[in-house]
Regions:
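C-terminal catalytic "cap/lid" subdomain
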Residues: 1-252
Length: 252
């Protein structure tokens, strides 16, 4: 099938229906790259990638496939080959099979361009406050990404920082200020931020990746604002003016 999103989902659904082992998606790119090849000439095409790695890259902005299509393929154990409609090249295989995988630790690097950071200063440090803050955001379909809560020194008040899409900033500010279930001392916003992430299943069994990432950023005097980690992803929030440099450092 050609195209993205709906046609990808249709192709995977048909592959499931006929019990196919593999689904080939023809699109306008010749595979999945370690980072955006339009911005970084040294980006490398990935021959094989795990479903979970592809899910992370798709959720962070890779437009090769939609996250829902990757998830459907994973759930139905269908290997997906991404190939170009215009050139005859091998493409990228999305799979869970460990056969023929290299020992590469980091599979891909992604960054976002449309994030905003919100810090609520001096909220009450008690159970249910975070839920009270995020409930109206959820009802208004505002996606909250990175979340950090400071340790309360006095057990009375704390600060809560989280990120959202910059397009949702005004609505979020309004919802927080209208929320009668919480009280706080100050609300601060920063639209000039970008999330830079490294993704790789190999990080699960490789010590020192976090240190190396942070050391690389420190060597270029790039300050980290927020940190978020999972088994196969490490994300940092940095000033948007440092995002491209940070992404270049993580490629080393």
């Amino acid at each position: 099938r050609s195209g993205r999103s709906g046609s990808d989902a249709t192709a995977i659904m048909l592959a499931k229906f006929i019990k196919a082992d593999e689904c080939i998606i023809y699109t306008d790119v010749d595979g999945v790259y370690t980072t955006d090849p339009r911005q970084y000439k040294k980006a490398k095409k990935i021959k094989k990638i795990f479903y979970d790695e592809m899910l992370e890259m798709a959720s962070l902005g890779s437009k090769v496939m939609q996250p829902t299509s990757v998830q459907d393929a994973k759930l139905n154990k269908i290997d997906v080959k991404v190939k170009s409609s215009f050139v005859s090249k091998s493409g990228t295989l999305i799979t869970n099979s460990k056969k023929a995988f290299s020992d590469q630790i980091i599979t891909g690097i992604s960054s976002t361009k449309n994030d905003a950071k919100i810090t609520i200063v001096g909220v009450k440090d008690r159970p249910g406050v975070a839920a009270s803050i995020f409930k109206p955001l959820s009802k208004n379909l505002i996606n909250v990404d990175m979340v950090v809560q400071n340790i309360s020194l006095d057990g009375k008040e704390t600060d809560l920082t989280f990120t959202i899409k910059a397009d949702d900033l005004k609505k979020t500010e309004k919802l927080i200020k209208q929320n009668k279930k919480i009280s706080f001392k100050k609300l601060s916003f920063d639209k000039g931020v970008s999330k830079v992430s490294i993704i790789g299943v190999g990080m699960i069994t490789t010590p020192g990746i976090t240190y190396r990432m942070f050391q690389a950023l420190a060597s270029k005097k790039i300050n980290i604002l927020v940190i978020s980690t999972s088994e196969i992803k490490i994300s940092v929030l940095v000033s948007v003016k440092h995002a491209k440099r940070a992404r270049s450092e993580e490629r080393r």
